[in-house]
């Protein structure tokens, strides 16, 4: 959704073709987001699709499969693996995306500084981790460098009760996609 829109915009600006695999339930529910991507010239595909083995396997197992982020990632990675002219961009789930996600926290810090404020608590969603790191890391940097304004700072990660990743389950490595393509 948001990453697809960002990449679609960048593709338009630089004259690059973009294909977005969008989770089917989001594809159906977020018509405006999808139309924004297509307006910027992207091909938007509902995942699971018939275009990849990962998509076909998911549809064979459940013809009404609504998709998942992991499955959409699998389809995009598979597409990139099979086409030497294709590059894959990842907007979440992996550690290296934390850097560009910090734009959120940096922007927040700047806006708060304009009104001479600093938060006591920073709260962020945590699933794949990039949204939380995006909002929290710029503030945690202040805490690590013993900035007086950050003395009482608390950063709180909030997870969904339906699929907690911090408080329940097994602490182990998991792939960022459904097919195990990602490291």
Per-range role (PLM):
Residues 1-4:
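N-terminal cofactor/phosphate-binding cores enriched in small/glycine residues
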Residues 6-8, 14, 30-36, 40, ...:
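Glycine-rich phosphate/pyrophosphate-binding loop at beta-loop-alpha junctions
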Residues 19-25, 156-159:
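Short internal beta-strands
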Residues 78:
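Glycine-rich, acidic and aromatic/proline-enriched surface loops and short helix-turn segments
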